[in-house]
Protein backbone atom coordinates (compact mmCIF):
# COMPACT_ATOMS: atom_id res chain seq x y z
CA UNK A 1 0.00 0.00 0.00
CA UNK A 2 1.19 3.53 -0.84
CA UNK A 3 2.31 5.50 2.19
CA UNK A 4 0.61 8.90 2.14
CA UNK A 5 2.06 12.00 3.77
CA UNK A 6 -1.32 13.69 4.19
CA UNK A 7 -5.04 13.24 3.66
CA UNK A 8 -7.15 16.20 2.53
CA UNK A 9 -10.74 16.16 3.76
CA UNK A 10 -12.97 18.00 1.30
CA UNK A 11 -12.99 18.02 -2.49
CA UNK A 12 -14.25 21.54 -3.08
CA UNK A 13 -12.09 24.23 -4.61
CA UNK A 14 -10.03 24.64 -1.43
CA UNK A 15 -9.37 20.94 -0.93
CA UNK A 16 -8.36 20.42 -4.56
CA UNK A 17 -6.20 23.56 -4.63
CA UNK A 18 -4.43 22.48 -1.45
CA UNK A 19 -3.80 19.01 -2.86
CA UNK A 20 -2.29 20.60 -5.97
CA UNK A 21 0.01 22.75 -3.84
CA UNK A 22 1.19 19.85 -1.70
CA UNK A 23 2.09 17.58 -4.61
CA UNK A 24 4.25 20.41 -5.97
CA UNK A 25 6.14 20.15 -2.69
CA UNK A 26 6.73 16.46 -3.32
CA UNK A 27 4.18 15.13 -0.82
CA UNK A 28 2.04 12.07 -1.48
CA UNK A 29 -1.54 13.03 -0.77
CA UNK A 30 -5.07 11.71 -1.17
CA UNK A 31 -8.37 13.59 -1.21
CA UNK A 32 -11.44 12.33 0.63
CA UNK A 33 -14.88 13.87 0.27
CA UNK A 34 -18.54 13.20 0.88
CA UNK A 35 -19.13 14.98 -2.43
CA UNK A 36 -16.72 14.68 -5.35
CA UNK A 37 -15.84 17.21 -8.08
CA UNK A 38 -18.07 15.30 -10.52
CA UNK A 39 -21.11 15.88 -8.30
CA UNK A 40 -21.88 19.18 -10.00
CA UNK A 41 -25.58 19.03 -9.10
CA UNK A 42 -24.96 18.39 -5.41
CA UNK A 43 -26.02 21.02 -2.90
CA UNK A 44 -23.79 19.29 -0.36
CA UNK A 45 -20.93 21.64 -1.13
CA UNK A 46 -20.73 25.19 -2.43
CA UNK A 47 -18.00 24.99 -5.07
CA UNK A 48 -20.05 23.98 -8.16
CA UNK A 49 -22.51 26.84 -7.66
CA UNK A 50 -20.17 29.82 -7.61
CA UNK A 51 -19.99 32.42 -10.38
CA UNK A 52 -17.05 32.99 -10.04
CA UNK A 53 -15.44 36.36 -10.51
CA UNK A 54 -12.35 37.87 -8.94
CA UNK A 55 -13.61 40.82 -6.93
CA UNK A 56 -11.79 40.96 -3.63
CA UNK A 57 -13.76 41.66 -0.47
CA UNK A 58 -10.63 41.41 1.69
CA UNK A 59 -10.75 43.41 4.93
CA UNK A 60 -7.26 42.75 6.31
CA UNK A 61 -3.70 42.22 5.10
CA UNK A 62 -3.84 38.41 5.27
CA UNK A 63 -6.95 38.31 3.08
CA UNK A 64 -5.48 40.82 0.63
CA UNK A 65 -2.31 38.73 0.36
CA UNK A 66 -4.29 35.58 -0.49
CA UNK A 67 -6.47 37.34 -3.05
CA UNK A 68 -3.46 39.08 -4.63
CA UNK A 69 -1.59 35.81 -5.08
CA UNK A 70 -4.66 34.10 -6.56
CA UNK A 71 -5.13 36.97 -9.02
CA UNK A 72 -1.57 36.51 -10.25
CA UNK A 73 -2.09 32.77 -10.65
CA UNK A 74 -5.33 33.33 -12.56
CA UNK A 75 -3.29 35.34 -15.09
CA UNK A 76 -1.22 32.23 -15.74
CA UNK A 77 -4.32 30.03 -15.85
CA UNK A 78 -6.00 32.32 -18.39
CA UNK A 79 -3.07 31.82 -20.76
CA UNK A 80 -2.89 28.05 -20.28
CA UNK A 81 -6.60 27.14 -20.24
CA UNK A 82 -8.63 30.10 -21.57
CA UNK A 83 -11.86 28.08 -21.67
CA UNK A 84 -11.67 27.86 -17.86
CA UNK A 85 -10.37 31.30 -16.92
CA UNK A 86 -10.64 34.52 -18.89
CA UNK A 87 -9.89 38.20 -18.41
CA UNK A 88 -13.11 40.21 -18.71
CA UNK A 89 -14.25 43.81 -18.41
CA UNK A 90 -16.06 44.63 -15.16
CA UNK A 91 -18.59 47.45 -14.82
CA UNK A 92 -20.16 48.68 -11.58
CA UNK A 93 -22.97 51.24 -11.48
CA UNK A 94 -24.63 53.31 -8.76
CA UNK A 95 -26.83 56.38 -8.22
CA UNK A 96 -25.64 57.78 -4.86
CA UNK A 97 -22.43 59.75 -5.36
CA UNK A 98 -20.56 58.37 -2.33
CA UNK A 99 -21.68 54.74 -2.70
CA UNK A 100 -18.42 53.50 -4.29
CA UNK A 101 -15.37 53.13 -2.06
CA UNK A 102 -12.07 52.97 -3.91
CA UNK A 103 -10.83 49.37 -3.57
CA UNK A 104 -7.39 48.30 -2.42
CA UNK A 105 -6.88 46.39 -5.66
CA UNK A 106 -7.31 49.33 -8.07
CA UNK A 107 -3.61 49.15 -9.04
CA UNK A 108 -3.67 45.34 -9.32
CA UNK A 109 -6.49 44.97 -11.83
CA UNK A 110 -6.18 46.24 -15.40
CA UNK A 111 -7.34 49.66 -16.59
CA UNK A 112 -9.14 50.83 -13.45
CA UNK A 113 -10.99 54.10 -14.12
CA UNK A 114 -14.19 55.96 -13.37
CA UNK A 115 -16.69 55.99 -16.22
CA UNK A 116 -17.56 59.18 -18.05
CA UNK A 117 -21.18 60.38 -17.70
CA UNK A 118 -21.95 59.39 -21.29
CA UNK A 119 -20.77 55.83 -20.53
CA UNK A 120 -23.35 55.36 -17.76
CA UNK A 121 -26.86 54.34 -18.79
CA UNK A 122 -30.07 55.25 -16.96
CA UNK A 123 -31.16 54.93 -14.24
CA UNK A 124 -27.57 55.06 -12.97
CA UNK A 125 -25.44 58.18 -12.56
CA UNK A 126 -21.96 56.84 -11.84
CA UNK A 127 -19.80 53.90 -12.80
CA UNK A 128 -16.37 52.34 -12.69
CA UNK A 129 -14.65 49.81 -14.92
CA UNK A 130 -11.57 47.60 -14.91
CA UNK A 131 -10.49 44.17 -16.14
CA UNK A 132 -10.10 41.07 -13.97
CA UNK A 133 -10.73 37.34 -14.24
CA UNK A 134 -13.74 35.03 -14.27
CA UNK A 135 -13.88 31.24 -13.96
CA UNK A 136 -16.09 28.53 -15.36
CA UNK A 137 -16.39 26.94 -11.93
CA UNK A 138 -17.82 23.49 -12.79
CA UNK A 139 -15.17 22.96 -15.48
CA UNK A 140 -12.44 24.36 -13.23
CA UNK A 141 -13.30 21.83 -10.52
CA UNK A 142 -13.13 19.01 -13.06
CA UNK A 143 -9.82 20.40 -14.36
CA UNK A 144 -8.30 20.41 -10.86
CA UNK A 145 -9.52 16.86 -10.25
CA UNK A 146 -8.23 15.61 -13.61
CA UNK A 147 -4.82 17.18 -13.01
CA UNK A 148 -4.59 15.55 -9.59
CA UNK A 149 -5.62 12.14 -10.87
CA UNK A 150 -3.02 12.42 -13.64
CA UNK A 151 -0.49 12.92 -10.85
CA UNK A 152 -1.75 9.67 -9.22
CA UNK A 153 -3.65 11.45 -6.44
CA UNK A 154 -6.70 9.37 -5.44
CA UNK A 155 -9.97 11.24 -4.87
CA UNK A 156 -12.15 8.97 -2.78
CA UNK A 157 -15.78 9.22 -1.72
CA UNK A 158 -16.25 8.61 1.99
CA UNK A 159 -18.47 10.04 4.69
CA UNK A 160 -16.61 10.54 7.96
CA UNK A 161 -18.27 11.29 11.27
CA UNK A 162 -15.07 12.21 13.12
CA UNK A 163 -11.71 13.75 12.36
CA UNK A 164 -9.98 10.81 14.04
CA UNK A 165 -11.22 8.44 11.32
CA UNK A 166 -9.17 10.27 8.69
CA UNK A 167 -5.88 9.18 10.26
CA UNK A 168 -6.57 5.48 9.63
CA UNK A 169 -8.84 5.05 6.62
CA UNK A 170 -8.80 1.42 5.39
CA UNK A 171 -8.45 2.50 1.74
CA UNK A 172 -5.44 4.73 2.42
CA UNK A 173 -3.68 3.49 5.53
CA UNK A 174 -2.40 5.46 8.52
CA UNK A 175 -1.25 9.07 8.23
CA UNK A 176 -0.01 11.62 10.74
CA UNK A 177 -1.28 14.72 8.94
CA UNK A 178 -4.82 15.65 7.86
CA UNK A 179 -5.93 18.81 6.09
CA UNK A 180 -9.41 19.84 7.19
CA UNK A 181 -11.07 21.58 4.23
CA UNK A 182 -14.57 20.37 5.07
CA UNK A 183 -16.36 23.71 4.73
CA UNK A 184 -19.75 23.53 6.44
CA UNK A 185 -18.84 20.03 7.59
CA UNK A 186 -16.51 21.59 10.17
CA UNK A 187 -19.59 22.47 12.18
CA UNK A 188 -20.56 18.84 12.79
CA UNK A 189 -17.36 16.82 12.27
CA UNK A 190 -16.47 15.27 15.64
CA UNK A 191 -13.09 16.49 16.73
CA UNK A 192 -13.72 19.89 15.16
CA UNK A 193 -17.35 20.81 15.95
CA UNK A 194 -16.89 24.51 15.31
CA UNK A 195 -20.13 26.23 16.39
CA UNK A 196 -19.12 29.47 14.66
CA UNK A 197 -19.48 27.88 11.20
CA UNK A 198 -22.78 28.61 9.48
CA UNK A 199 -24.26 28.61 5.97
CA UNK A 200 -25.05 31.69 3.91
CA UNK A 201 -27.53 30.67 1.27
CA UNK A 202 -27.01 32.00 -2.21
CA UNK A 203 -29.40 31.87 -5.14
CA UNK A 204 -28.52 32.53 -8.78
CA UNK A 205 -29.99 32.12 -12.24
CA UNK A 206 -27.99 30.51 -15.04
CA UNK A 207 -28.93 32.07 -18.38
CA UNK A 208 -27.75 32.11 -21.97
CA UNK A 209 -27.07 35.63 -23.23
CA UNK A 210 -24.79 37.59 -25.60
CA UNK A 211 -22.94 39.26 -22.73
CA UNK A 212 -19.18 39.06 -22.23
CA UNK A 213 -18.72 41.63 -19.46
CA UNK A 214 -19.24 41.41 -15.70
CA UNK A 215 -21.62 43.85 -14.04
CA UNK A 216 -22.45 44.77 -10.48
CA UNK A 217 -24.85 47.08 -8.67
CA UNK A 218 -23.28 49.15 -5.90
CA UNK A 219 -26.50 50.70 -4.56
CA UNK A 220 -28.28 48.72 -1.83
CA UNK A 221 -31.48 46.95 -2.80
CA UNK A 222 -34.73 47.09 -0.76
CA UNK A 223 -33.90 43.67 0.68
CA UNK A 224 -30.47 43.97 2.37
CA UNK A 225 -29.77 40.29 1.69
CA UNK A 226 -30.06 40.76 -2.08
CA UNK A 227 -27.35 41.82 -4.53
CA UNK A 228 -27.31 42.29 -8.28
CA UNK A 229 -24.38 40.99 -10.30
CA UNK A 230 -23.69 39.43 -13.70
CA UNK A 231 -20.82 36.97 -14.30
CA UNK A 232 -20.32 35.46 -17.77
CA UNK A 233 -18.65 32.06 -17.71
CA UNK A 234 -15.69 31.44 -20.04
CA UNK A 235 -16.33 28.97 -22.82
CA UNK A 236 -18.41 28.75 -26.00
CA UNK A 237 -21.84 28.13 -24.44
CA UNK A 238 -22.79 31.74 -23.71
CA UNK A 239 -23.59 30.89 -20.11
CA UNK A 240 -24.01 33.77 -17.67
CA UNK A 241 -24.61 33.67 -13.91
CA UNK A 242 -27.07 36.23 -12.52
CA UNK A 243 -27.24 36.85 -8.81
CA UNK A 244 -27.98 36.92 -6.12
CA UNK A 245 -28.57 36.86 -2.40
CA UNK A 246 -26.73 36.27 0.86
CA UNK A 247 -28.90 34.70 3.57
CA UNK A 248 -26.97 33.85 6.76
CA UNK A 249 -28.06 30.77 8.72
CA UNK A 250 -30.48 29.67 6.01
CA UNK A 251 -30.00 25.92 5.43
CA UNK A 252 -32.70 25.67 2.76
CA UNK A 253 -31.63 24.72 -0.76
CA UNK A 254 -35.05 25.44 -2.23
CA UNK A 255 -35.35 28.01 -5.01
CA UNK A 256 -37.39 31.07 -4.02
CA UNK A 257 -39.35 32.17 -7.13
CA UNK A 258 -39.69 35.72 -5.82
CA UNK A 259 -35.93 36.03 -5.36
CA UNK A 260 -35.37 34.59 -8.85
CA UNK A 261 -37.71 37.16 -10.40
CA UNK A 262 -36.00 40.00 -8.55
CA UNK A 263 -32.59 38.78 -9.75
CA UNK A 264 -33.76 38.77 -13.38
CA UNK A 265 -35.29 42.25 -13.08
CA UNK A 266 -32.30 43.86 -11.38
CA UNK A 267 -29.78 42.25 -13.71
CA UNK A 268 -31.75 43.32 -16.79
CA UNK A 269 -31.59 46.89 -15.48
CA UNK A 270 -27.82 46.51 -15.06
CA UNK A 271 -27.38 45.09 -18.57
CA UNK A 272 -30.43 45.30 -20.85
CA UNK A 273 -28.63 43.20 -23.51
CA UNK A 274 -29.36 40.14 -21.37
CA UNK A 275 -32.75 39.97 -23.07
CA UNK A 276 -31.14 38.84 -26.32
CA UNK A 277 -32.95 41.62 -28.20
CA UNK A 278 -30.31 44.30 -27.97
CA UNK A 279 -31.88 45.72 -24.83
CA UNK A 280 -35.25 46.32 -26.48
CA UNK A 281 -37.00 43.46 -24.67
CA UNK A 282 -37.79 42.90 -20.99
CA UNK A 283 -36.46 40.73 -18.21
CA UNK A 284 -39.02 38.10 -19.24
CA UNK A 285 -37.15 37.63 -22.53
CA UNK A 286 -33.98 36.41 -20.81
CA UNK A 287 -33.26 32.77 -21.74
CA UNK A 288 -33.18 30.94 -18.40
CA UNK A 289 -31.30 27.64 -18.27
CA UNK A 290 -31.46 26.81 -14.56
CA UNK A 291 -32.17 28.18 -11.10
CA UNK A 292 -29.43 27.41 -8.58
CA UNK A 293 -28.93 27.53 -4.84
CA UNK A 294 -25.83 26.88 -2.77
CA UNK A 295 -24.69 27.18 0.83
CA UNK A 296 -21.56 29.24 1.38
CA UNK A 297 -19.38 27.93 4.25
CA UNK A 298 -18.97 30.96 6.52
CA UNK A 299 -17.14 31.27 9.84
CA UNK A 300 -17.77 34.15 12.22
CA UNK A 301 -14.08 35.03 12.54
CA UNK A 302 -13.35 34.33 8.88
CA UNK A 303 -11.07 31.66 7.45
CA UNK A 304 -9.47 29.26 9.89
CA UNK A 305 -6.01 28.47 8.58
CA UNK A 306 -3.85 27.04 11.34
CA UNK A 307 -1.94 24.00 12.52
CA UNK A 308 -3.25 21.99 15.47
CA UNK A 309 -1.45 19.12 17.17
CA UNK A 310 -3.67 16.32 18.42
CA UNK A 311 -3.56 12.94 20.11
CA UNK A 312 -5.71 10.07 18.87
CA UNK A 313 -6.28 6.60 20.26
CA UNK A 314 -5.30 5.58 23.76
CA UNK A 315 -7.60 5.94 26.71
CA UNK A 316 -10.05 8.80 26.78
CA UNK A 317 -11.83 9.75 29.97
CA UNK A 318 -15.46 8.71 29.92
CA UNK A 319 -17.97 11.36 29.00
CA UNK A 320 -15.55 13.58 27.10
CA UNK A 321 -16.03 14.33 23.40
CA UNK A 322 -13.20 13.98 20.91
CA UNK A 323 -13.02 17.71 20.19
CA UNK A 324 -9.35 18.67 20.04
CA UNK A 325 -8.28 15.09 20.57
CA UNK A 326 -5.96 16.03 23.45
CA UNK A 327 -7.42 13.91 26.24
CA UNK A 328 -5.79 10.61 27.14
CA UNK A 329 -2.67 9.10 25.62
CA UNK A 330 -2.14 7.75 22.13
CA UNK A 331 -0.65 8.61 18.76
CA UNK A 332 0.47 12.20 18.19
CA UNK A 333 -0.85 13.60 14.92
CA UNK A 334 -1.47 16.98 13.30
CA UNK A 335 -4.30 18.69 11.47
CA UNK A 336 -4.13 21.86 9.41
CA UNK A 337 -7.49 23.59 9.26
CA UNK A 338 -8.63 25.41 6.11
CA UNK A 339 -12.33 26.22 6.31
CA UNK A 340 -14.74 29.11 6.73
CA UNK A 341 -13.85 31.15 3.63
CA UNK A 342 -17.48 32.09 2.94
CA UNK A 343 -18.11 33.67 -0.48
CA UNK A 344 -14.42 34.17 -1.32
CA UNK A 345 -13.41 30.56 -1.98
CA UNK A 346 -12.32 30.86 -5.60
CA UNK A 347 -10.75 34.31 -5.52
CA UNK A 348 -8.62 33.35 -2.50
CA UNK A 349 -8.18 29.63 -3.18
CA UNK A 350 -4.63 29.56 -4.52
CA UNK A 351 -3.39 32.04 -1.94
CA UNK A 352 -4.88 29.92 0.83
CA UNK A 353 -3.29 26.80 -0.67
CA UNK A 354 0.10 28.53 -0.71
CA UNK A 355 -0.27 29.64 2.92
CA UNK A 356 -1.39 26.20 4.00
CA UNK A 357 1.55 24.65 2.16
CA UNK A 358 3.87 26.75 4.30
CA UNK A 359 2.16 25.45 7.45
CA UNK A 360 2.58 21.89 6.19
CA UNK A 361 6.28 22.56 5.51
CA UNK A 362 6.71 23.64 9.13
CA UNK A 363 4.77 20.60 10.36
CA UNK A 364 6.81 18.15 8.27
CA UNK A 365 10.09 19.77 9.34
CA UNK A 366 9.13 19.57 13.00
CA UNK A 367 8.15 15.91 12.61
CA UNK A 368 11.47 15.14 10.89
CA UNK A 369 13.43 16.94 13.61
CA UNK A 370 11.60 15.01 16.33
CA UNK A 371 12.31 11.68 14.62
CA UNK A 372 15.98 12.61 14.25
CA UNK A 373 16.24 13.12 18.01
CA UNK A 374 14.91 9.64 18.76
Curated annotation (Swiss-Prot):
Which enzyme class? Answer: oxidoreductase
Q: Name one Pfam family in it.
A: DAO
| Keywords from the named record | Disulfide bond, FAD, Flavoprotein, Glycoprotein, Oxidoreductase, Peroxisome, Signal
Q: Please tell me whether the keyword Glycoprotein is annotated for this protein.
A: yes
Residues binding anthranilate 1, per UniProt? 229, 296
UniProt keyword Isomerase, yes or no: no
Gene Ontology process terms (BP)? D-amino acid catabolic process; detoxification
User: What induces this protein's gene, according to its Swiss-Prot or TrEMBL record?
Assistant: Expression increases when grown on D-methionine as nitrogen source.
Residues spanning the signal sequence? 1-19
Among the GO molecular function terms of this UniProt record, one is: D-amino-acid oxidase activity
Q: Which PANTHER family match?
A: D-AMINO ACID OXIDASE (PTHR11530), FAD DEPENDENT OXIDOREDUCTASE DOMAIN-CONTAINING PROTEIN (PTHR11530:SF30)
In the record, the note on similarity to other proteins reads: Belongs to the DAMOX/DASOX family.
Outline what the protein does. Catalyzes the oxidative deamination of D-amino acids with broad substrate specificity. Enables the organism to utilize D-amino acids as a source of nutrients. Enables the organism to utilize D-asparate and D-glutamate as a nitrogen source and may also contribute to utlization of D-tryptophan, D-tyrosine and D-asparagine as a nitrogen source. Protects the organism from the toxicity of D-amino acids, including from D-glutamate. May play a role in its interaction with the host.
Q: What is the protein name for this chain?
A: D-amino-acid oxidase 3
Q: Where does this protein come from, organism-wise? A: Cryptococcus deuterogattii (strain R265) (Cryptococcus gattii VGII (strain R265))
UniProt lineage: Eukaryota, Fungi, Dikarya, Basidiomycota, Agaricomycotina
Amino acid sequence: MVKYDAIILGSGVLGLSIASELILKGLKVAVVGKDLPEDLDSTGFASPWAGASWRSVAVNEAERRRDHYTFEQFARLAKEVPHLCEKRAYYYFWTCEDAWKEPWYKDLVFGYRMLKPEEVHAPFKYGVTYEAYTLNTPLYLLHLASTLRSAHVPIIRARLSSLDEAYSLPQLGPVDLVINATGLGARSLLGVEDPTVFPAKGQTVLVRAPVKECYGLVDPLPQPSQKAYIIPRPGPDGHVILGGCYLPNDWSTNVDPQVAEEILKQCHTLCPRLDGKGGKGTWKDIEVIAHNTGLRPVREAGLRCELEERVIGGKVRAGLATKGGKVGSGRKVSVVHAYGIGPAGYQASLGIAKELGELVDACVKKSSDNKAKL
